[in-house]
Amino acid sequence: MTVPPPAELRAEELRVRIGGATLLDAVSLAFAPGRITGLLGPNGAGKTTLLRAVAGLTRPSAGRVVLDGEDLHALTARRRARRVAFMEQQADTRLSLPVRQVIELGRTPYRGRWPVPMDSAADAHERSVFAEAVAAADVGHLLDRAWPTLSGGERQRVQLARALVQEPGVLLLDEPTNHLDLRHQLGFLGAVRGLGVTTVAALHDLELAAAYCDEVAVLLDGRLVAHGPSSDVLTSPTIAHVYGVDVTVERHPRHDRPHIRWNGLLPEGTSP
């Protein structure tokens, strides 16, 4: 799929406080342009909060998000939407729209009206963007289905297509494999990896993160505790500290990435 040049995205001393609670605490993180960074950490670590902040949906209490040298939160919503696509855990499309129109909603920042009749009146570029996104997400057979009839996994893939038609330089994914079976998990992440877009994905599955992410960033209690190549970060001590589990980390015999073998839970309060 043809995509814009990968964007440069970074968080600088990012803090988010909501209702007296600190959800992010001085997080500084540069995301590798054109590569996939996995956001890891237990529930409540701050992964979704960080994604929403770098998407421009949650304004930081301090610090800033920089996109290609500009303060992200100083951009208009339309300009942000042309450069950053955010795929949330659950789509909030309540109307009984056909899948084709759900995907077309992703072109709203460019067309400024809804629904967008790409299949009849749009120019060649619009049709090409739509066709490439549909192919990349493997949803061509779903185009005439109604959104409410889709399974959770089918909705995830339609959401990806809707994000891709935005032609983003940054793709933000919040637990994108949650509702997918194993085959579609691998296919989904493989498709994303082949895009060459600056991608940040919150994931719970450490094996998937090790296999598909170029870098990983680990959060705990709203703080960044590790960031770097998966082979450097996904170590037994780090996993024990963050998740409270005993693991053995080996090299995968086929792709030379970390392979994690689970040994059991660590007693609470145990130091690795």
Task: Name each model-derived stretch.
Residues 104, 119-142:
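Conserved ABC ATPase "signature" region
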Residues 171-175, 180:
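Catalytic Walker B motif of ABC-type/P-loop ATPase nucleotide-binding domains
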Residues 236, 240-272:
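ABC ATPase nucleotide-binding domains
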Residues 63-71, 80:
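Conserved ABC transporter NBD signature motif
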Residues 55:
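Helix-to-loop junction immediately C-terminal to a conserved catalytic motif
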Residues 165-169:
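A short, proline-enriched helix->beta-strand linker immediately N-terminal to the Walker B motif
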Residues 40-42:
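The feature captures the beta-strand-to-loop junction immediately N-terminal to the Walker
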